[in-house]
């Protein structure tokens, strides 16, 4: 929607056909624009429909491995993977992002950490390292406070010996 309102071309990718349908419906509004918006079902491990060095900005919000599953059995859905498998797939995402991004342009990734067996697993920083290993440089690390999380009420009522994870990172990388 923002790309259409700002008269910018955009490509939107999601693995879940329901999300694609929602996006297509949300784009049905009228405004004065010449933008071209392409919504495609798929995942970002294979962007073969985009030529090298054609994208000015990438913004992504991947799942946090298998913490919340976005489908039951969609092939290629990385929300169904273990942390190790997720990071392997994110390595492919980082490679493809690097390939399609123009030199000097930015890629923003919003992701947070997770908790496993009472310990914090720094998934955000692991994903950051994946992108750095693929050649990106770190431009900014933004800490975004989370509000109204689905599980906050549940965890606040439990007898815990740990703090709630109440933030996400927005890592801004430059090619």
What residue spans do the PLM features occupy?
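Class I S-adenosyl-L-methionine-dependent methyltransferase catalytic core
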Residues: 1-175
């Amino acid at each position: 929607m923002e790309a259409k309102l700002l008269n910018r071309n955009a490509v939107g990718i999601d693995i879940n056909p329901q999300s694609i349908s929602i996006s297509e419906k949300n784009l049905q509004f009228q405004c004065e624009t010449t933008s071209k918006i392409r919504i495609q079902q798929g995942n970002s491990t294979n962007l073969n429909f985009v030529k090298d060095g054609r994208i000015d900005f990438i913004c992504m919000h991947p799942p946090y491995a298998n913490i919340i599953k976005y489908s039951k059995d969609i092939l290629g859905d990385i929300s169904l993977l273990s942390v190790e498998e997720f990071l392997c797939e994110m390595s492919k995402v980082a490679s493809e992002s690097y390939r399609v991004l123009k030199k000097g342009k930015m890629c923003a990734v919003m992701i947070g950490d997770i908790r496993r067996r009472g310990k914090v697993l720094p998934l955000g920083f692991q994903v950051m390292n994946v992108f750095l290993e693929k050649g990106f440089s770190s431009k900014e690390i933004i800490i975004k406070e989370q509000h109204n999380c689905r599980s906050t009420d549940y965890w606040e009522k439990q007898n815990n010996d740990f703090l709630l994870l109440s933030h996400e990172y927005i890592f801004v990388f430059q090619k």
